[in-house]
Design a protein with these regions (language model features):
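PLP-dependent class I/II
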Residues: 1-206
């Protein structure tokens, strides 16, 4: 939430910290949620490295192109390291990224609307199952608490895959130290999501 971003900025300025902000999902925000770029706040531009790319907003996963904005002295040093490793992004990816930025943006909005439909479908299905989750205000993932299944998240995912063929990832891969959460993605078409949810429901009744 913007209020938390402002608190982080206040701490960064107080203790003279550099902030690294991954804003890859900045354009995939839903309903009453709001994205605030920390580098846009007062006196934060000179202490913020903002990372972004094209894989999420423009569905260009595999083109392997992104960008960084930040203080010139830091970015210059980062560029030197980058040149020692891989020189530059391939030419067609650069042209593709330019076309994405300069071209019509209607497709981005349509994609976002479709993600939102899938998001709401998943939320309704999880409510029906009885799983709790954090409000997914952006991106295309839902972090879901599965403790009322009687299993740890790791065992839940393993058993679900073995018995139903549905692949989910436990939150332990993303910082969940209590093994209570799974990460559910709604990138797939709605019919596949519906089938997966039905399989999860049947799995819980076994």
């Amino acid at each position: 939430p913007p209020e938390n971003i402002k608190k982080i900025a206040k701490i960064a300025k107080k203790y003279d910290l550099i902030v690294i902000a991954d804003e890859i999902y900045a354009d995939l925000i839903y309903e009453n949620h709001e994205h605030l770029s920390i580098g846009s706040l007062e006196n934060m531009k000179e202490r913020t490295l903002t990372l972004n790319g094209f894989s999420k907003t423009y569905a260009m996963t595999g083109w392997r192109i992104g960008y960084i904005a930040g203080p010139q002295d830091i970015v210059t040093k980062m560029t030197e390291v980058r040149h020692a490793l891989s020189i530059n992004s391939c030419t067609f990816s650069q042209y593709g990224a330019l076309a994405a930025l300069e071209g019509p943006q209607e497709a981005v909005q349509k994609m976002k609307e479709e993600y939102d439909l899938r998001r709401k479908f998943c939320m309704k299905a999880l409510d029906d199952i009885g799983f709790t989750y954090g409000d997914p205000g952006g991106a295309f993932y839902i972090y879901t608490n599965v403790t009322n299944s009687g299993l740890t998240a790791s065992h839940f995912c393993k058993n679900l895959l073995q018995k139903t063929g549905v692949l989910l990832f436990p939150g332990t891969l993303f910082g969940d130290t209590e093994d209570k959460y799974i990460r559910l993605s709604y990138l797939q078409p709605i019919d596949k999501i519906e089938e997966s949810m039905n399989r999860i429901k049947r799995f819980l009744k076994l």
